[in-house]
Swiss-Prot record:
One Pfam family per UniProt: OSCP
Family: Belongs to the ATPase delta chain family.
Name of the protein this chain belongs to: ATP synthase subunit delta
Topology class, membrane: Peripheral membrane protein
Organism the protein comes from: Bacillus licheniformis (strain ATCC 14580 / DSM 13 / JCM 2505 / CCUG 7422 / NBRC 12200 / NCIMB 9375 / NCTC 10341 / NRRL NRS-1264 / Gibson 46)
Function description: F(1)F(0) ATP synthase produces ATP from ADP in the presence of a proton or sodium gradient. F-type ATPases consist of two structural domains, F(1) containing the extramembraneous catalytic core and F(0) containing the membrane proton channel, linked together by a central stalk and a peripheral stalk. During catalysis, ATP synthesis in the catalytic domain of F(1) is coupled via a rotary mechanism of the central stalk subunits to proton translocation.
InterPro entries: ATP_synth_OSCP/delta_N_sf, ATPase_OSCP/d_CS, ATPase_OSCP/dsu
NCBIfam families: ATP_synt_delta, PRK05758.2-4
Lineage: superkingdom: Bacteria
Compartment(s) where it occurs, according to its Swiss-Prot or TrEMBL record: Cell membrane
GO CC, alphabetical: plasma membrane; proton-transporting ATP synthase complex
Length: 184
């Protein structure tokens, strides 16, 4: 079974528990933090994935590192240790977020801009692009990228809306290169 399919199964099981206990948002926040730590601390992954480190020691490391998370998240991590699948934690977190978003009718969006956007601008992007994405609402995160020169670039799931000056220049360059190839 592929890692993606396995991640979806664990995420679905955890999501069911979250629904029953009415902790969908809290568990999502916890998983986001856990994912960040797993990505940033490669040594943690190395220890948890090492076959010579006993499972009980791995669980103690998890308890010491993530003792403040909910029992459901901690026990999911323990289960992943028992089944030697701790490497799927970031994917599991991503799948859980997708399920939580579907449940709420929301989508995550990243708006790249040359300068930080105001709350009013972020709210405006959320309203306009929520309809475009077919969602009730968008959770917008703003990332500053001076390479855009001007305008904005918006990523919603795997869709990108590029209204940046850099994007327009790149499209003009490709168009001119295509015309030159036809002539040459």
């Amino acid at each position: 079974m592929s890692q993606s399919a396995v991640s979806k199964r664990y995420a679905a099981a955890l999501f069911d528990i979250a629904l029953e206990s009415k902790l969908v948002n809290e568990i999502e926040e916890e998983l986001t933090v856990v994912k960040k730590i797993f990505i940033e601390h490669k040594d943690l992954n190395a220890v948890l994935g090492h076959p010579k480190v006993p499972a009980e020691k791995k669980k103690q490391i998890l308890k010491d590192s993530f003792g403040s998370v909910s029992t459901a998240v901690l026990h999911t991590l323990y289960l992943l240790v028992d089944r030697s699948r701790t490497s799927i934690v970031p994917d599991l977190a991503d799948e859980y977020v997708k399920m939580a978003n579907r449940f709420r009718g929301t989508e995550d969006a990243i708006v790249y801009s040359v300068k930080p956007l105001s709350e009013e601008e972020i709210s405006s992007f959320s309203q306009v692009f929520a309809k475009e994405a077919g969602a009730a609402s968008l959770r917008v995160r703003n990332e500053v990228n001076p390479d855009l020169i001007g305008g904005v670039k918006i990523r919603i799931g795997n869709r990108i809306y590029d209204g940046s000056v850099r994007g327009k220049l790149d499209r003009i360059e490709r168009q001119l290169a295509g015309e030159n190839r036809k002539k040459g």
